[in-house]
From Swiss-Prot:
Phylogenetic placement of the source organism: Bacteria, Pseudomonadati, Campylobacterota, Epsilonproteobacteria, Campylobacterales
Signal peptide boundaries: none
Molecular functions per Gene Ontology: ATP binding; tRNA binding; tRNA-uridine 2-sulfurtransferase activity
UniProt GO BP: tRNA wobble position uridine thiolation
Keyword ATP-binding: yes
Domain of life: Bacteria
Protein name: tRNA-specific 2-thiouridylase MnmA
Organism: Sulfurovum sp. (strain NBC37-1)
Gene that encodes it: mnmA
CDD domains named among the record's database cross-references: MnmA_TRMU-like
């Protein structure tokens, strides 16, 4: 008797491949799905071939599911429009909420499949998400906006694995050896080299403008506001500057960037919108990560209406509007919100 049916998101990479192998060994009836999300040249032909190889090895059914229209509406356009507004979006978080753990779950429903799995490095007990054992690969941050209703259906077998062990496991299976040595995929799947190249397909991003200080005085020049994010310290000119200067604000309406020394980036409190919590909380203490690769900082959160105020016990640097703040209680993810 099987543990139930599970739909595994297969990308052609080692993580999703080993995920499918492990779940089958654990007694699940596995089906795979390859999700076509964008039109990156040559991307899908190669990966679909790898997915079919995995399906043949495991003798499982695999589906090719075109979600490019939904991805474009929920992720790609959000990415482009956010940069137009001088914001710094996190497309991976929105993709996880709307596509991988939104549309993929809906697709599982049409197939009569109870569980959904991916090769993400994190853990889930059906009620909460937890950080992975491999701290360097932990991806729990990116699921802070996933709807709590889907948590009981999610499986993440790599949450207790170390990345090197995953590669070694694949290398010991003759048919899957090539998966162990292939290059890691990029963080943002539709970006080939840099986000600038994506934006340049839709608008003119090379618009030289003024660099100003916090008092509004013109102190230099820059190459176009969409080239910058909060905290960036290169790519613009400041007259007579001896200390490093950083972007501390972006003004798209005037094509200006505001710069200052590092202490100007310091923030002790901020607000979030689009609050997503895995339990009913109104006012609570926890830790918050304001970017993926940052340390969690203790804080106090108070929710009022559709927004929450986050007061920090120590300052953070480089808060960027539209980035995601993920809330933790130790390794347990409580949810998150979008910085505003």
């Amino acid at each position: 008797m099987t543990k139930g049916k599970v739909l595994v998101g297969l990308s052609g990479g080692v993580d999703s491949t080993v995920t499918a192998v492990l779940l089958q060994k654990e007694g699940y009836e596995v089906e795979g799905v390859y999700m076509r999300l964008h039109d990156k040249p040559g991307y899908h032909e190669d990966n679909w071939g790898k997915v079919q190889k995995v399906a043949d090895y495991l003798r499982i059914k695999v589906h090719f599911h075109d979600l490019s229209e939904a991805f474009n509406a929920n992720v790609y356009e959000y990415f482009v429009e956010s940069y137009k507004k001088g914001l710094t979006p996190n497309p991976c978080v929105m993709c996880n909420r709307t596509i991988k753990f939104g549309k993929m779950v809906e697709f599982a429903d049409t197939l009569g499949i109870e569980f959904v799995a991916t090769g993400h490095y994190l853990q889930c007990d059906g009620n909460y998400i937890y950080a992975a054992e491999d701290a360097g690969k932990d991806q729990s941050y990116f699921l802070s906006e996933v709807k709590k209703e889907v948590l009981p259906r999610l499986l993440f077998p790599l949450g207790t694995w170390i990345k090197d062990d995953v590669k070694a496991y694949a290398a010991n299976i003759d048919v899957l050896k090539e998966f162990a040595t292939q290059a890691e995929s990029s963080e943002i799947c539709f970006v080939e080299n840099s986000y600038d190249e994506v934006l340049a397909k839709h608008m003119n991003i090379d618009m030289p403008g003024e660099t100003v200080d916090t008092q509004g005085n013109v102190v230099g020049t820059h190459k176009g506001y969409m080239h910058y994010t909060i905290g960036k310290r290169r790519g613009f000119f400041v007259n007579g500057a001896h200390d490093p200067h950083f972007v501390i604000d972006i003004k798209p309406e005037s094509n200006q960037i505001v710069v200052g020394t590092r202490e100007k980036l310091e923030e002790n409190a901020f607000e979030v919108k689009q609050i997503n919590l895995f339990e009913d909380l109104v006012e609570f203490d926890c830790e918050v990560k304001v970017r993926y690769r940052t340390r969690a900082v203790p804080c106090h959160i108070k929710i009022e209406g559709e927004r929450a105020t986050v007061v920090l016990t120590e300052p953070v640097f480089g808060l960027a509007k539209e980035q995601v703040a993920a809330f933790y209680d130790g390794r347990r993810l409580l949810g998150g919100g979008v910085i505003c």
